[in-house]
Amino acid sequence: MGFTIEADLNTEKSRKAWLEWKRQTDPKHYLRPEDRKTSAHVDHQRILRRLIADGVIPSRHYWGTIHCNGVNAQGDVAGVTTTSGLAWKIPGRVGDSPILGAGLYVDGTVGAAGSTGRGEANLFNLSSHLIVESMRQGRHPKDACLEALRRIRSNTIERRLRKPNGDPNFNITFYAINARGEHAAVAMYAEDDNERGWAGQTDGRRVRYALCTQDGPKTLPCEGLIPGALQDPA
């Protein structure tokens, strides 16, 4: 496409942080498929929280994915999902962000959808494609996002990915816009006890997302499929 490929964008500081993360990585990250079926839940974020507490990485870098949708006055639709790249990735893992239909999908005549959160759920359900196709059938972006979340909830069957009550023990947030400019952000859990939620800033426990129109930027509360926060007891 004409872009110059950089050989290595690491700094000495970032490389040291990555090496420390790699040193602390739990062997249970590397479960074989046959072992994953019966494995108990592993808190993969524990290492990152410890690295932040130790000052190895700043708290603002806890999450790495950003999604943005847009539509202009002519009705042209666009969407983009960025991620943290190779940082904190399990060797061999393929993220959802670069997979069209998983972490991102756009149809210029219908709308755009993308997400932040557990990428494997998107790869399994092709969630962004599902949302855009739901909007094609006339659903509002909010209802289309809720349908994708319900699909993920029902398809999450591995014990290690479920709370004692059967609900997912991970969060995921969808962002969608249609060609008319109607928009929504909907999370599996729209409340969060952490300083920052999957979607961005929290207002008390309510996660909020950013919106920018001709009237300027503002934040709005996310809707949620499951009441409460991910951290609430099941």
Please give the residue ranges for each predicted region.
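N-terminal nucleophile
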Residues: 1-234
